[in-house]
């Protein structure tokens, strides 16, 4: 996992509340066995509508997704995060997230930022008015800056540490590689070994 320090660029003003993981990535896409290539399935059913915000040329290349309350609710499929990330989003801003989706984002290097509903509304309106506007999510300073918005956000210290250092669950374990190897060398030969 790559470290996340700052996500800066155009934003996609989705704004919908209660977007579930089936809407983020349809179940048809779950037949894939790789973790890559899910971006093309992001909001697939909604993208059939030519007026859907993600289809608009002015929003191409957005790196920050701005959503409504309870983003990522529904099933626990990690594929939803893979689709968001594979499409190019490094951060998602919303008033609230489903817990499992938020946790999956952390484990995959996508920064989730919870801001008050009114702040998210102002940011959505500003980006809808000026699609070229830059939104900056700075994890080091815990700030979000955009047109008419400059605010701080809270994030768990350990989650912040993981993201800043690019540590997924495997990366956290590998920080103890020497201890693991020492333990394996000290185990009796008749015990199962990890290769």
From Swiss-Prot:
Short name of one Pfam family: Aconitase_C
Catalytic activity: (2R,3S)-3-isopropylmalate = (2S)-2-isopropylmalate
Listed pathway(s): Amino-acid biosynthesis; L-leucine biosynthesis; L-leucine from 3-methyl-2-oxobutanoate: step 2/4
EC numbers, comma separated: 4.2.1.33
UniProt GO BP: L-leucine biosynthetic process
Record keywords: Amino-acid biosynthesis, Branched-chain amino acid biosynthesis, Leucine biosynthesis, Lyase
Keyword match Lyase: yes
Top-level taxon in the UniProt lineage: Bacteria
GO CC entries: 3-isopropylmalate dehydratase complex
Gene Ontology molecular functions: 3-isopropylmalate dehydratase activity
Family: Belongs to the LeuD family. LeuD type 1 subfamily.
Known function: Catalyzes the isomerization between 2-isopropylmalate and 3-isopropylmalate, via the formation of 2-isopropylmaleate.
Assembly, per entry: Heterodimer of LeuC and LeuD.
HAMAP family on file: LeuD_type1
UniProt name for this protein: 3-isopropylmalate dehydratase small subunit
Organism, scientific name: Rubrobacter xylanophilus (strain DSM 9941 / JCM 11954 / NBRC 16129 / PRD-1)
